[in-house]
């Protein structure tokens, strides 16, 4: 429990940083929404996961709210889910729009080089040299945000397992389809069972979509 409390404190620091950036760069609620997160259960095993998770959160001193089948139907418009667990201190981020707006804000003080893939890293004379197909950049420190490609730069050899995830999105729903679907205009559900699927309904510039 103590380890998870410390990790949650780190997570809260990151969320606070993201919230400050959202305010500074004028991000809309469609991009940055402190609406909490629902762990949705569609099976008995999922409900078991949620009950155990709720107990663990209580031991950590964290708030959570149990959502029954009627609550889930009111939110999603569907009777697919048996129940859900809402953790209110989490945030939903439209990551592509967030990164774009974040980059626009940072570009006031830094240079951003897009479409310039780093193909290799060299360390000489106490500095790093990031080499691209058409040039290079040197810096005393480098942050590698490359996920599984960490191995491509010589780190964590034989330590990572690559997992491919896929996503799909509906076309813009018609007004009649939105009425038939029901539920709240925007919501998100993460799977209580680790092998389940995340589902989001959005309502914004691109219309209503799932």
Q: What residue ranges belong to the model's regions?
A:
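Flexible hinge/switch segments at interdomain interfaces of large molecular machines
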Residues: 30, 71-79
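Generic secondary-structure signature for well-ordered alpha-helical cores
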Residues: 13-27, 59-63, 77, 107-111, ...
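Helical element adjacent to the flavin cofactor pocket in flavoenzyme catalytic cores
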Residues: 48, 55-56, 60, 79-141
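Dinucleotide-binding Rossmann-like beta1-alpha1 core, especially the glycine-rich loop
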Residues: 1-69
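Active-site substrate-recognition segment that forms the wall
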Residues: 16, 24-32, 118-128, 136-210
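General beta-strand structural signal in soluble alpha/beta enzymes
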Residues: 65-68, 112-114, 132, 144, ...
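A short small-residue
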Residues: 1-2, 82, 210
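Short, solvent-exposed beta-strand edge segments and adjacent coil->beta transition regions
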Residues: 35-37, 82-84, 165
């Amino acid at each position: 429990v103590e380890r998870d409390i410390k990790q949650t404190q780190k997570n809260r620091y990151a969320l606070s940083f993201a919230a400050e950036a959202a305010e500074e760069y004028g991000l809309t609620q469609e991009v940055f929404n402190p609406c909490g997160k629902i762990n949705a259960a569609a099976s008995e095993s999922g409900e078991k996961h949620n009950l155990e998770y709720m107990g663990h959160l209580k031991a950590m001193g964290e708030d959570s709210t149990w959502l029954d089948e009627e609550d889930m139907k009111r939110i999603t418009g569907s009777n697919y889910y048996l129940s859900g667990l809402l953790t209110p201190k989490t945030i939903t981020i439209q990551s592509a729009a967030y990164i774009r707006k974040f980059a626009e804000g940072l570009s006031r003080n830094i240079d951003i080089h897009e479409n310039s893939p780093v193909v290799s890293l060299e360390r000489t004379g106490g500095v790093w040299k990031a080499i691209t197909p058409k040039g290079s950049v040197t810096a005393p420190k480098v942050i590698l945000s490359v996920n599984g490609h960490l191995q491509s730069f010589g780190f964590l050899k034989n330590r990572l397992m690559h997992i491919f995830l896929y996503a799909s999105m509906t076309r813009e729903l018609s007004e009649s389809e939105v009425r038939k679907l029901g539920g709240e205009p925007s919501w998100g559900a993460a799977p209580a069972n680790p092998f389940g699927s995340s589902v989001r309904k959005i309502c914004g510039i691109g219309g209503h979509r799932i």
